[in-house]
């Protein structure tokens, strides 16, 4: 784990989230993740793990409190500026949500295409990301031809292709067997070793306890 002198990448200050039905997903939460740190969010279903990640990713907004990203409050960021902030993040879900009509290469390239990267740069970055997750030879395959573990690795490649400062993962091993789960966690460790801040929500305590990271 690489940590940048204790500087905080993410900080929650008294964050609460209440939904329209009156349910309090989070109440007065204070939390921080250092630059270059890898940590886990644990807890039972409904404990607010996914909500916390959605607030960081600006998929949802808090009811009260501050969310600091590199010292800047993003809790009330205008919608116009959200895409710029999200480019600093890679987001991975339990279901990778791959597009069935697009090849693996095209799925991974999607964030770069949206951001307006040149064709040559897209090719270089996509192939580097696929090589990192061990799927370069399958760049022309379609998602339905891959196993569940391979599809999750495609999701990870797509999340890191724009070289984010932060990786957020919501139950990334939830549908995988123990061996594949360990492989996915090893990938997160590799990205963390080059300075990426990693925050993973997981209820898999058996797997987490094998790893020496903050809970």
Region annotations inferred by a language model:
Residues 57:
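Helix-to-loop junction immediately C-terminal to a conserved catalytic motif
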Residues 74-90, 193:
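ABC ATPase NBD coupling module
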Residues 102-109:
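Short coil-to-helix segment of the ABC ATPase nucleotide-binding domain corresponding to the Q-loop/switch region
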Residues 161-165:
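A short, proline-enriched helix->beta-strand linker immediately N-terminal to the Walker B motif
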Residues 142-146, 150-152:
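Conserved ABC ATPase signature
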Residues 167-170:
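Catalytic Walker B motif of ABC-type/P-loop ATPase nucleotide-binding domains
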Residues 65-73:
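Conserved ABC transporter NBD signature motif
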């Amino acid at each position: 784990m690489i940590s940048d002198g204790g500087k905080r990448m993410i900080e929650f200050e008294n964050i609460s989230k209440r939904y329209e039905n009156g349910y309090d997903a989070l109440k007065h939460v204070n939390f921080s993740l250092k630059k270059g740190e890898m940590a886990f969010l644990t807890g039972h279903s409904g404990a607010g793990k996914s909500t916390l990640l959605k607030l960081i990713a600006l998929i949802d907004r808090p009811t009260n409190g501050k969310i600091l990203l590199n010292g800047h409050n993003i809790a009330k960021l205008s919608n116009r500026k959200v895409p710029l902030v999200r480019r600093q993040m890679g987001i991975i879900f339990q279901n990778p949500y791959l597009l069935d009509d697009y090849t693996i290469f095209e799925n991974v390239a999607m964030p770069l295409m949206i951001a307006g990267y040149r064709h040559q740069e897209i090719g270089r970055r996509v192939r580097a990301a696929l090589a990192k997750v061990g799927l370069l030879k399958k760049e022309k395959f379609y998602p339905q031809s891959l196993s569940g573990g391979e599809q999750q690795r495609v999701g990870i490649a797509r999340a890191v292709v724009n070289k984010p400062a932060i990786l957020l993962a919501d139950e990334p091993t939830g549908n995988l067997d123990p061996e594949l789960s360990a492989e996915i966690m090893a990938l997160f460790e590799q990205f963390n070793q080059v300075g990426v801040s990693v925050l993973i929500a997981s209820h898999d305590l058996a797997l987490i306890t094998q790893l020496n990271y903050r809970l």
